[in-house]
Amino acid sequence: IVDIHIVSDEYKLVSKKWKAKPTSIDLGDNIFIKDGEMAVITGPCSIESEEQIRAVVAHCVENDIKMMRGGVFKPRSSPYAFRGLGLEGLKLWYQIASEAGIKIVTEVMQTSQIEEMYPYVDVYQVGARNSQNFNLLDELGKVDKAVMIKRGISGTIEELLQSAEYVFSGGNEKLILCERGIRTYE
């Protein structure tokens, strides 16, 4: 073999070659995520209490931050670690955040959670551990909400784009790719 030429990209729909139009995601209330503009999302790793939610929402309001992240369903390395407040915690968070005009970004870990979370979430987050959960990505392709995919722990850029392709090919073009850093073996 002297030379190799790729005839077809594995991520046609999300490639700038095929979709040159800049992305603009409308989250409502005049809050947009756009190409070329930095979007700040702040918040704790996990949502743990009403007091914590109120404190972080107040911080967001004081600093003109429109999006808050946090986990109500947490994938933990240890089965004994706190795994989040679940759906009831999300409902409480939504009530407090929506009163302040703050959008919610939170992780969905399995397909069965998508529908129950839908009324309370503005951006579904696919965490690093689930960035190649193809059943989850397929189902998120069918929802009319933004999806933020974090790059996998040891994932390549190509794998991140292929994960995005699953969501996009299902019809959901409201995609955010999150570069979270990776673990290498160098």
Give, region by region, the residue ranges found by the protein language model.
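Hydrophobic faces of well-ordered beta-strands that scaffold small-molecule active sites
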Residues: 38-44, 66-70, 104-106, 124-126, ...
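Non-catalytic terminal accessory/regulatory regions of metabolic enzymes
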Residues: 1-40
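Alpha-helix-loop-beta-strand connector modules within alpha/beta enzyme cores
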Residues: 82-106, 139-146
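Catalytic cores of alpha/beta
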Residues: 50-58, 112-120, 157-163
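Acidic (Asp/Glu)-rich catalytic clusters
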Residues: 33, 57-64, 95-99, 118-119, ...
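Glycine-rich, proline-tolerant flexible connector loops at the mouths of alpha/beta enzymes
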Residues: 69-87
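Conserved anion-binding
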Residues: 72-76, 130-186
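Active-site mouth loops of central-metabolism enzymes
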Residues: 38-55, 78-84, 103-107, 127-128, ...
